[in-house]
Structure formats: structure tokens, C-alpha cells
């Protein structure tokens, strides 16, 4: 099956869209989480566009100010223990003298991490990171692989994999067995993905560089080749990651969101058609835009009656959620989207994220 994907012509066109959700430790040189400290050099009224504020006040209502206060504050640093090379108890023993670790409820291998003497330390310089014992990964970014729940021996596709935080997490849950196809459209990002897979000891995978239409062609030419599970961590506007990258506000524009929504609908449809009967797909983004989230999922449900949107139980995950957006402007949104997991930065003091779990009914 790995050979089947390898024979396709490699697509050289690089993606112009980067996902902030997978970027490694890019926080400021301060551990101060206050909004005021972060905006010393960039006044808030200069940073935030009026049309951005108008749009989000309409979307969030009275929660807008809370959203902005969290979005303009620093994000807590996190690590995920890589069970392919180490274990939680071993990492605790190695780090506990210098670091304070706070468990992340929804991921048993995840921890918020702070330096005990209060000084800043780049987590990417830790020996445990270089050895692949840990992965520096934002807490909300750990949710999609947990919801996907890949099993050992399965055939799994990560459609937008680079640079690899979720991909290596999937491989860990698969216990390095089965087949993991890790795809991205960017050559430079694929190099980073390959390095992270090697560092983390992943050896059940193949790397592919294909745009989504190539997967569509594979599905048409090889109808018997299907995946047990697929993760579509789609390129998005990243408005849930403002606290990691303030430029997200400056880059925001409605036309770009509409364009991204079209790309996302194409990705989710192609991925759904690559699923085995009773297979599971997780669609996720690091934006809180309903046009990129609930509307994309609704598009799939409208087109495919055998697409079932499964409920993601926040109580089992130990996570707080914001109710799904069921009505916004002229978007066509199905009532079933209440089963999706919508997380705003102020819910759990993380990035904003959206996660949907979809099953292909037989």
C-alpha cells in the first residue's frame, strides 16, 4: 500500500498558507502573561483593524473583550511526552528538579511546563527535545489526534501533516504499527516533517507531497484503497492562534476566509471519499471562524447522507467548550454541528480550536 502512494508524481508547488497550530516554541522573551506587557510596543488600537473588531463583536457578543484579552496575552508553554522513546514517569524524573509540570486533562502525555526559578528557557534547547523524548506542542493542538483515536495496525492518513506535532502523536497512538501516510504540499515543510518523524522514532510511515486532487485521483483509480482513519488539520486563518502570532490580526480579511473555506470544503470531501466504510475522519482548524468550521462540516453533511457527525464528549476529555455556532450571517449551518468541539482561548487558557469527528456510515 505504501508503494501505491509512492508511484504518483510529486507535486512541486509549495503551499502559501502556513498553519500556526503546529509551530514550535515561538513565545516572547518574557513569561509575563499580561496583555499590557505584550502591547508595550504595539498599541491595541493600532493592532486591531476596525473591520476585525466589528466582525468579532458580532460573532462573540459580550465575550469579545474576553476573547481579545486572552488572544493578546502570552500562551502557556506545553510539552507532550513521546511514548515511542520514553514515558511520563521517566520524563517527570528527568525534568522535575528544574521544571514544574502541570497535567493537561485531555492528553495523558501532555503537560504545561514552567521553569521553577521563573526564568525563560527555550524548550527547543532541552536535551529531551533533541532526543525525541518530548515534543513541544500547544495543548489544544493535542486534541485532534486524541479525538481521532487511531489504533495499532490501522491505515491512517494525515492529509496536512507538516511540521508533525499531530502526526507524531498519531504514530505514538498507533504504537509504530500499521501504515501512517503523512502528506503535505510544501517541500520545505515536508523536510521539517521528516526530521521530526526521525527525531521521534516514527518508522511506520511514508511521506508524500501531494495536493488534494492527487488523492482524489488515487481514490478514482484504486477504489479498494481506503483509510481506516484520516486527520484533516486544514490550513486556516488561524484566528485561534493570535496569542502566538499577533500578525494573524494584521493578515485577517473576509475574502481570504472565503477562499480558505473553499479549500477546506475540497479537503474534507476528498478525505471523506478516501475513508473505508465505518471509517473515522477528524476535521480540525485553529480558527474560530464559523465559515471555516461549522459551515465546512455542514457542507459535507448536506452532500453526503452517509456522513455522521459524532458527539465529542467534553466531560470525558476534561475540557471546557463554547457552544457551536448555529447561525451567523448568511452561512448555511446544520443543527448537528452542536456535536463539534469549539474551543475559544478563554475556555481553557489555550489557543482557539475547532474539532469535528465524522464517521462514514456503511
Cite the ranges covered by each PLM segment.
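S-adenosylmethionine
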Residues: 1-362
Amino acid at each position: 500500500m505504501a508503494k501505491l502512494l509512492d508511484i504518483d508524481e510529486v507535486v512541486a508547488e509549495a503551499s502559501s498558507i502556513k498553519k500556526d497550530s503546529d509551530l514550535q516554541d515561538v513565545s516572547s522573551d518574557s513569561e509575563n502573561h499580561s496583555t499590557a506587557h505584550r502591547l508595550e510596543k504595539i498599541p491595541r488600537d493600532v493592532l486591531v483593524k476596525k473591520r476585525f473588531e466589528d466582525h468579532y463583536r458580532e460573532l462573540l457578543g459580550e465575550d469579545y473583550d474576553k476573547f481579545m484579552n486572552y488572544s493578546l496575552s502570552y500562551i502557556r508553554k506545553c510539552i507532550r511526552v513521546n511514548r515511542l522513546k520514553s514515558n511520563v514517569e521517566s520524563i517527570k524524573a528527568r525534568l522535575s528538579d528544574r521544571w514544574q509540570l502541570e497535567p493537561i486533562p485531555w492528553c495523558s502525555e501532555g503537560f504545561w511546563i514552567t521553569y521553577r526559578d521563573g526564568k525563560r528557557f527555550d524548550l527547543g534547547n532541552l536535551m529531551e527535545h533533541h532526543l525525541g523524548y518530548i515534543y513541544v506542542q500547544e495543548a489544544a493542538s493535542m486534541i485532534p489526534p486524541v479525538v481521532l483515536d487511531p489504533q495499532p495496525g490501522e491505515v491512517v492518513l494525515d492529509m496536512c501533516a507538516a511540521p508533525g506535532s499531530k502526526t507524531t502523536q498519531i504514530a505514538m497512538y498507533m504504537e509504530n504499527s500499521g501504515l501512517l501516510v503523512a502528506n503535505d504540499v510544501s517541500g520545505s515543510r515536508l523536510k521539517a516533517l521528516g526530521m521530526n518523524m526521525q527525531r521521534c522514532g516514527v518508522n511506520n510511515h511514508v511521506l508524500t507531497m501531494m495536493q488534494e486532487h492527487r488523492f482524489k485521483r488515487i481514490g478514482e483509480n484504486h477504489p479498494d484503497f481506503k483509510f481506516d482513519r484520516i486527520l484533516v488539520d486544514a490550513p486556516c486563518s488561524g484566528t485561534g492562534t493570535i496569542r502566538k502570532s499577533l500578525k494573524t490580526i494584521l493578515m485577517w480579511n473576509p475574502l481570504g476566509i472565503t477562499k480558505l473555506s473553499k479549500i477546506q470544503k475540497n479537503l474534507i470531501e476528498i478525505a471523506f471519499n478516501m475513508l473505508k466504510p465505518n471509517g473515522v475522519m477528524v476535521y480540525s482548524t485553529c480558527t474560530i471562524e464559523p465559515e471555516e468550521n461549522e459551515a465546512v462540516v455542514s457542507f459535507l453533511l448536506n452532500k453526503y447522507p452517509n456522513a455522521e457527525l459524532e458527539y465529542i464528549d467534553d466531560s470525558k476529555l476534561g475540557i471546557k467548550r463554547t457552544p457551536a455556532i448555529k447561525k451567523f450571517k448568511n452561512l448555511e449551518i446544520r443543527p448537528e454541528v452542536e456535536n463539534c468541539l469549539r474551543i475559544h482561548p478563554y475556555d481553557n487558557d489555550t489557543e482557539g480550536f475547532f474539532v469535528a469527528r465524522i464517521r462514514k456510515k456503511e
